[in-house]
């Protein structure tokens, strides 16, 4: 049984709105993490082709929206195949955040790629947050496909404010992750300008700690850096968010909520490493297991409507309601 694993959490800047260049940078970071002994490497929300930061500066930008569609990643594509091949060549698990292009509709998606290059699962964010809805669609059921067994342990992933969705979190906890990847866009310190603390560096770190404590898993809090090139590319200098260089606050939290990593300056790129000892999970589980001994399913339980809902369904495979015949 695996007892320890070395992980790598990126804090990096994509090549904004450039699919090919960001895929190349992804592979470079995968190789770097593997060369430093990592068995798993993580990437933030919409890492490919970069988070669409302009949505917080203006409600509509048709030119950038068109560019974004054309540079978003298709799961069945040569670009994804390149990332899979890189994972296999470096024998490392990859948890990838990306803007998914599915027939030119976009979704905030994550993929967990095995160390042999096989895609173990893909998932879409349950619901885009606020202005993200001007770009992205909702999941249609595959948001629940979030935890899989890998060579680095049992790994799960959620994106951004999915971490404040109590029912979705509990569903993920119940799948018994050992390592949780929390993918975020660029995040900034809270300021007294009317912005939400829960969207800040400090607020999201609190969310990560809470997730670790509630799930008794290691949380790999993965964020993006935005530099002046990104600000200029998306014209966000007058926006409410992501208007100045920075955004990085990647971190690693233990199953009792303690921070296990030292921060990288917010405007700098780098990779955070840690050796995770799964013994710490057992220490926490001995005290609390919200899906086990510290629960009351006879009183409170979660119902789930499972399965992916397709837009077109064959009537032959669609359940027909049965009407009971009343006796005369």
From Swiss-Prot:
User: Which InterPro entries would you find in this protein's record?
Assistant: C-N_Hydrolase, C-N_Hydrolase_sf, Nitrilase/CN_hydratase_CS, Nitrilases_CHs
Q: Which UniProt keywords apply?
A: Hydrolase
Mention one GO molecular function: hydro-lyase activity
- Which parts of the chain span the membrane according to its record? none
- Every copy of the CN hydrolase domain together lies at 5-278
In terms of superkingdom, the source organism counts as: Eukaryota
Catalytic activity as recorded in UniProt: a nitrile + 2 H2O = a carboxylate + NH4(+); 4-chlorophenylacetonitrile + 2 H2O = 4-chlorophenylacetate + NH4(+)
UniProt similarity note: Belongs to the carbon-nitrogen hydrolase superfamily. Nitrilase family.
**Protein name per UniProt:** Arylacetonitrilase
